[in-house]
Amino acid sequence: LQPERSVNREIGAKWDIKPDLQASLALYRLDRGNVAVVDQADVTRIILVDGQYVRGIELDLAGRVTDAWQLMGGYAYQAGEITATQSATAIKGNRLAHLPKHSASLWNRYDINQTVGVGLGIVYRASIFANVDNLVTLPAFTRFDAAVYWTLNPALQLQLNVENLANKHYFASANSNNNISPGAPRSAWVKLNYHF
């Protein structure tokens, strides 16, 4: 296969709302050629899609709101499509696979005192197409995550994380219309950090 080609144009701005809280904004357009995709007419075959673009806007916010409250979040709007018909399945005007129009995430950590902190986060992804033929749609989903932090002493911290708190069933990704991966069920892990 020929190598992929791309041209990216981007403009952005950053704002220090206060010394430890920053926001950023970026607008972009990415034009790509020779992009390898699975041919839905013959899933054992890879074809090159020569002509697609993505344009979008990204907003990010990260830092401390107060001494006890930290947050990190972002939102993205993306639009992308095939700009030239390549095959019976990769048709001009089709939306790109795996590209949600809207996605957002927000993570909050609040330190109750110097020993204990809690975290809560949300992840949202709008629906996406499994492939460039736009025949199979993976539905939108919203997932909640949580954490508890304990400072045992200045050098030792314990952390419990729970991902997919509500045990939401969702589809995370797809390699083709018939190779779709589910999102992970509720999972938890413990982490011990030692600083020396």
Give the residues covered by each predicted segment.
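Short flexible/disordered coil segments
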Residues: 42-48, 60-62, 85, 91, ...
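Outer-membrane beta-barrel translocator domains and adjoining extracellular loop/strand segments
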Residues: 35-43, 78, 82-90, 129-136, ...
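Gram-negative outer-membrane beta-barrel transporters
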Residues: 24, 29, 48-132, 166, ...
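Outer-membrane beta-barrel signature, preferentially recognizing the C-terminal barrel domain
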Residues: 1-24, 29-32, 37-64, 96-102, ...
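Structured loop/turn residues at beta-strand edges in well-structured enzyme cores
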Residues: 19, 67, 154
